[in-house]
């Protein structure tokens, strides 16, 4: 499998500084873990009964750099390692973790997690069933193992390119971060899965100023890729110029209108609205507890027949993709909404067992310190049949939203407020003036029923998304084609109240 980009055209050699990133039996080779040890830890976890137990080993190496005022202001490299032990008894979960991978400390964590149960000891399934190998991100040299000088070069190039774009660009901040996460997941049901998960991301933020007015633009990209990714088509200059373009554009933008009107969402990153206002409501834990607006609606119409929404953790190189989830289950493509009909939820092992549904491979966690829960991977709406130009031409008066900043959503009812960081007026079927201060206010399930046109131009985001839930952050992908929402409330600059919705 070849990556969808070319290597650096000058033949740059990004040499390794650490050879320890081989994913094959990482914890066996580097920490002396054996299958006998794993069986012993699981037996300790089930020593007081319990329906299920698992172990999550993690070794994370990471790098981060930040350039501000044309100089490197921060640089960090780090390593963390640990093991989390979970015991499930009915609907109760016991969890304990340790950053010491010695046998004594893992056994102590296992016995601590076991305190949730109070029944005769159970015996784990004899022997492990190892997951079939899959390689969605087969990098030869993970970014975290490349020379730091090459990473410094990237952020300095971004700073230079943004400042050269226009003299009105007065402030630039460029950042780079990468990591390599080695995991081992074993469970009392025989699960055995290993993975080595690379991740890299670059961001550029620019501030333009003139006549007492200022505006910000941001851009970036990445994925489960090697450092060479940033020396190809998706390079620092591309991100820097895009961030600068956005900032300059906003300097002359006019105030956003207010009221209910047609809204056209551009392809790609605007899919964050779908992710937040709809996607979280389709996670199984919320539906099991009946706190989601979508609870009990399987088989019912929840969207326009033009809407098909999927979550797909199997896309090569994508930020939200995983060979296996954090419970050792292979990820998959899950159809959530098909032609407007709700088909299913995103589940982990616990939700699947308690709800009597299939495990979709969406059990994710931030680190060994956290319990897994149902989470999205790459969530997007499939392309439709409409041409983007026809969608714009169909709007007499409305807003074209291209990029989004922050937002808030209440999972229980789907209400959301999102700020558009780049948007334009649509007047008489044409995109006209840029606008600033636009917020989109609505209800996720309701908005989907108002989608009347879906473009044939599906696009995924550039690989910068991070999703937060219950204090845990995980990398994700989002995407949509151009789509038209017939009626949506647009709040202009004068509107300050965001309705108090939860993030």
Residue ranges and their predicted role:
Residues 5-7, 11-503:
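N-terminal small-residue-enriched
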């Amino acid at each position: 499998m070849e990556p969808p980009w070319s290597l650096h055209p000058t033949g740059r050699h990004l040499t390794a500084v650490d050879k320890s990133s081989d994913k094959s039996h990482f914890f066996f080779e580097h920490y002396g873990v054996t299958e006998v040890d794993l069986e012993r830890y699981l037996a300790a976890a089930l020593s007081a009964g319990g329906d299920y137990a698992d172990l999550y080993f993690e070794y994370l190496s990471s790098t981060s750099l930040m350039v501000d005022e044309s100089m490197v202001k921060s640089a960090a490299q780090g390593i963390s390692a640990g093991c989390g032990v979970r015991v499930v008894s009915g609907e109760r979960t016991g969890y304990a973790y340790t950053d010491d991978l010695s046998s004594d400390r893992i056994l102590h964590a296992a016995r601590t997690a076991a305190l949730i149960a109070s029944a005769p000891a159970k015996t784990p399934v004899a022997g492990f069933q190892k997951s079939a190998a899959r390689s969605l991100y087969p990098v030869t040299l993970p970014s975290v193992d490349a020379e730091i000088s090459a990473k410094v070069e990237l952020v300095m190039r971004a700073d230079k390119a943004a400042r050269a774009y226009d003299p009105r660009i007065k402030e630039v901040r460029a950042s780079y971060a990468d990591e390599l996460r080695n995991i081992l997941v074993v469970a009392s049901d025989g699960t055995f899965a290993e993975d080595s998960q690379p991740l890299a991301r670059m961001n550029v933020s620019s501030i333009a100023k003139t006549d007492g007015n200022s505006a910000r633009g941001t851009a970036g990209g990445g994925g489960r890729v090697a450092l060479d990714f940033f020396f190809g088509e998706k390079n620092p200059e591309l991100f820097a110029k895009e961030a600068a373009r956005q900032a300059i554009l906003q300097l002359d933008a006019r105030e956003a209108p207010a009221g209910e009107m047609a809204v056209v969402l551009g392809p790609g990153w605007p899919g964050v609205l779908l992710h937040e206002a709809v996607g979280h409501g389709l996670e199984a834990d919320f539906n099991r507890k009946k706190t989601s607006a979508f609870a009990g609606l399987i088989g019912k119409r929840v969207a326009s027949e033009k809407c098909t929404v999927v979550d797909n953790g199997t896309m090569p190189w994508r930020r939200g993709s995983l060979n296996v989830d954090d419970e050792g289950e292979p990820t998959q493509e899950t159809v959530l909404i098909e032609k407007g009909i709700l088909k299913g939820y995103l589940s982990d092992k616990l939700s699947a067992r308690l709800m009597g549904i299939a495990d979709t491979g969406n059990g994710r966690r931030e680190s060994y310190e956290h319990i897994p829960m149902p989470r999205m991977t790459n969530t997007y709406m499939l392309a439709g049949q409409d041409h983007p130009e026809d969608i714009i031409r169909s709007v007499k008066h409305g807003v074209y939203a291209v990029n989004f900043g922050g937002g808030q959503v209440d999972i229980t009812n789907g209400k959301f407020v999102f700020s558009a960081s780049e948007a334009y007026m649509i007047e008489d079927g044409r995109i006209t003036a840029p606008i600033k201060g636009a917020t989109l206010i609505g209800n996720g399930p309701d908005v989907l029923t108002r989608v009347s046109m879906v473009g044939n131009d599906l696009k995924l985001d550039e690989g910068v998304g991070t999703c937060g839930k219950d204090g845990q952050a995980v990398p994700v992908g989002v995407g949509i084609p151009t789509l038209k929402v017939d009626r949506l409330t647009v709040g202009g600059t004068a509107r300050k109240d965001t309705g108090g919705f939860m993030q």
